[in-house]
Structures are given as structure tokens and as C-alpha cells.
Amino acid sequence: MQINGITPQALTAYGIHDVRDIVYNPSYELLFEEERSPTLQGYERGIETQLGAVAVDTGIFTGRSPKDKYIVRDDVTRDTVWWSDQGKGKNDNHPLSQETWTHLKQLVTTQLSGKRLFIIDAFCGANPDSRLSVRFVTEVAWQAHFVKNMFIRPSDEELEGFEPDFIVMNGAKCTNPNWQEQGLNSENFVAFNLTERIQLIGGTWYGGEMKKGMFSIMNYLLPLKGIASMHCSANVGEKGDVAVFFGLSGTGKTTLSTDPKRQLIGDDEHGWDDDGVFNFEGGCYAKTIKLSKEAEPDIYGAIKRDALLENVTVLADGTVDFNDGSKTENTRVSYPIYHIQNIVKPVSKAGHATKVIFLTADAFGVLPPVSRLTSDQTQYHFLSGFTAKLAGTERGVTEPTPTFSACFGAAFLMLHPTQYAEVLVKRMKAAGAQAYLVNTGWNGSGKRISIKDTRGIIDAILNGSIDDAEMQTLPVFDLAIPTSLPGVNPDILDPRDTYASVEQWQEKADDLAQRFITNFDKYTDAPAGAALVKAGPKR
């Protein structure tokens, strides 16, 4: 049997033997039948919900497993990858020997041999000259469905000459019994070989490992070509003006980039090259915990046939209880991007960005709701990737927990963070783009900055009115802040005004400044990082 040039014999080149059958780039209709088959058991089997989407469980792994991420250290990667065992920074790029890689590959190929396999050929990246052609191999129907949702679906013509640049072999059912003597973290593994151009997955069923795996690879390849690779959402206005939104979980990235006046380019992963900003993906991977039709109608409306729900609670009658986080707070849904109405068509790309927005949810109550950044401050705050959450303590007191994640996506960076900052600023300068730091968190009132005020701030950035505003400088962080903005409560623009006394703010500001300084020290082992210290806060 031959399908599009793929035969069971051809898979022997990957080390997969005696394949019973190949289901190549199956239709959504076929996947719908396959993943609900009564012959399936355990995590393989999905159930149909009243919304029309199929729901699956991913087992004990309801999120990525960063401690089980490995990269083969060889001549290709030795001097380029930002390794976990080198320099001052802690990251998830754990080195793997060629010998251990060979063993892990044998485990996965043995698991996939003799099976009926699903093969999905897809693109990562909307621009033909920089996209990755990726071949996914799995024995699980819903994992093929996830890939079909999340990556860019080739046309029939594009499939005819499809040659994979990268191969992902998902052996979720196999684990590594020799992990201890090999010095690994556990029996589970997500391993990359940049020379062989293969990703191996073992022990974890979580679909996001395939999505973020290829994002990590793009994060390795593109900056080395001078193309910015970004963990951000992006949209475009009626006049073709593009904005990108960086931010960690809970900062409002998805909410604020979803705007009825603007078309969505994408919600999570983008590149920026000589032509402009482009999406890496062909779908969205949205959180669904406490999802409601009223609060997020776009996402709720996207959950229908062909969408794939993960780790949600499905009642006996097929209804989904989105408020139930008993399996995980990280309940998700993947769906093709065309399930959202207001998107850029037919290709998820637009021109150069003129507005770059860093979102932070500062629970310390120090940072202003908005500030305009200099070029050096842009790099500094991009490298810092700060946000903070309020976490309850045993005594019932809520204390902020700071998070610093380089480039607002440290888990997915393969190169030193300063390389991403340099490429981003180079692209911004060429496009005449301006960066802003927007705090969607708290201030001295103890209340979170209202979504109304935050949307007013975003509107002022996008329509340019913030650039006409009178500015003053906030001490300690040396940030330029507006004294007034249309549609925004003027009493909140200077965070000092939200405290009973300036001294109260000053005390908190000194504390937060020291946290920034301590965190940034890890970048000073690179000359580019050391040069940026002056752009940070002063104590």
C-alpha cells in the first residue's frame, strides 16, 4: 500500500518496522470516528460532548513536563544552545548524550513498530521560505487530531511534494526503564536531536508537547537567520497596523488581543521577518477553566465539531462542566483557527508591527498601568519577562509571588535570551515600532486595574493618542508614564497616587526593584546582557 509516497517500508528509515497500516492525513470525519471507537481503552478513547467536540484525558500529565526535556549535545548544538548546566541562568535545555538518545529512539520506534499508525504532514510557520515541514507519527487518533488542529494544514498540491524538515515520533505509551542509570529525571522524556531533526516523546500523553516542541525548534532556527521568534498574540487593524502582545499566563494576552475592531493573526506563536509578522500555527489552544459563553463568546463558539477538549469534566448527558478543575486547572481546547470569525484570511500573516505590548500583572502594586519604553528598556523588560500572582499563605495573608520568564516564554527558548532580544529590537527599529509596558495587575488601592481602564490604555496605544500625551518619569524604574489618557481614570496612571503616602509606594518599589536586579544578574554573563543593566531599576 502506498499513500502519497509513504509506504510501511519507507518508515524503516525512521527505525519503525512491520507497520500494519498507515492512516495518512485523515479527514476530520475519519478522526471523529477513529478516536471514539468502542475498541479503544484508557487515554486513547475520546467521548463526544453535547457541544459536538470530542473530549479526551491526558492522564497524569495535564501540562508540559519541562524537567523531562532533553537536547542532544553534539557539534551542531554545543556552542549554540543555552544549556541548563552552563552560565548563570537556569533553564530546561538539559543535555543528552548520543548514546542515551539512541536508546530513547529505540524505545519509541519499537513502540510504534507493528502498529496501525496515523501520520500527519503539516507546516509550522505561515511563510513558505521559513516554515518547517513537519511529519508527525503516532498510534493515537486523537493525537493526530490535535496536530491537525494546531498546525498549518497543507493543500493537496503541497502534500504531493512534501518532504519533512523535522519528524516527531510520539510514543506516549512507552517509558524509559533505564532512566536512573542514564542520569535522567524520570521514565518520561521529550527529547530533541537537531542533527537528525527528530523529536521523541515517551511517557506523556499531553498534546502540548508536540505544539511547544516545534515552537522550541522554531525558536532555535529562526533567530539564527535574523528572524524574530515570539511567544505572543498578534492582531491587525483596518489600516493594516499590526500589534503584538507578549505576556505570561494570566496577564490578559488572549483577552486583550481579541478585539472586534481588529483581525486576529494568531494567539500564541509568531515570527517577524522581512515581510512582517506571521503565525506559526493553524489553530488555537485555549484555556477553558471557568469558560462561559458570556465572558468569552469567541472561544466558547469555537468549541464545536472538530474541536478537541482536554481534561474537562463531561457529565453523563454529554454536557461539559467548565468550572470543574478537579483533573487540572489547565483544561484546554484545540481548534482550527477558522473556528474564530474575525481572523486574517487566507494566510495568518500581516505587515510589520508598529506597536509592541508587554503585559504584566504586577501583584506588588508598584508598576504603572502603562509606560512607554526606550530601546534599552524594551530589551531589559523583554529579558526580565516579569509578572506576579497573589498566592494565599497559611495565615490567610496574600503575598505576591513574582515570576520572571525570559522573553515571556523561557520554557521554549533554545538560544541565550539576549539573542531573542537583539533580533526583536532590530526588527522594531527597522519598522519604527514602539514598545509599551502595560500592567493589568494591582495598585495601591488593593484592587485590580479594571478591564475598562486597561482596554482604554490599549486603545490609546493602538490609535496613537498615548504618544501625544504629556509624560512624566516614575522614579526607581525610570519609566515614562502619561499624565492623562482618553477614557482612562487619571487617578491610576501614577501608581504613587493610589497609596496613602508616596513612602508606602517607595518601600514596595525598592523591594520589587531588588527582585528585578537579582533576576537580571543571570544575563550579565553575556556582554549584551551586562550592557542593559543600566536600563533597569535603580535602588
Swiss-Prot record:
E.C. no: 4.1.1.49
Positions that bind ATP: 212, 231, 247-255, 296, 332, 448-449, 454
Gene Ontology molecular-function annotations: ATP binding; metal ion binding; phosphoenolpyruvate carboxykinase (ATP) activity
Swiss-Prot/TrEMBL catalytic activity: oxaloacetate + ATP = phosphoenolpyruvate + ADP + CO2
Gene3D superfamilies given in the database record: 3.90.228.20, Phosphoenolpyruvate Carboxykinase, domain 1, Phosphoenolpyruvate Carboxykinase, domain 2
Disulfide bonds listed in the record: none
Main location: cytoplasm
One Gene Ontology biological process: gluconeogenesis
Function: Involved in the gluconeogenesis. Catalyzes the conversion of oxaloacetate (OAA) to phosphoenolpyruvate (PEP) through direct phosphoryl transfer between the nucleoside triphosphate and OAA.
Pathway: Carbohydrate biosynthesis; gluconeogenesis
Binding partners and assembly: Monomer.
Enzyme kind, highest EC tier: lyase
Transmembrane annotation, as ranges: none
Residues that hold Mn(2+) according to the record: 212, 231, 268
Keywords tagged on the record: ATP-binding, Cytoplasm, Decarboxylase, Gluconeogenesis, Lyase, Manganese, Metal-binding, Nucleotide-binding
Binding site for substrate: 64, 206, 212, 332
Organism (species): Pectobacterium carotovorum subsp. carotovorum (strain PC1)
Family: Belongs to the phosphoenolpyruvate carboxykinase (ATP) family.
Cofactor(s) listed in the protein's UniProt record: Mn(2+)
Record note on cofactor: Binds 1 Mn(2+) ion per subunit.
Subcellular location: Cytoplasm
Any one of the GO CC terms: cytosol
Annotated gene: pckA
Annotated protein name in UniProt: Phosphoenolpyruvate carboxykinase (ATP)
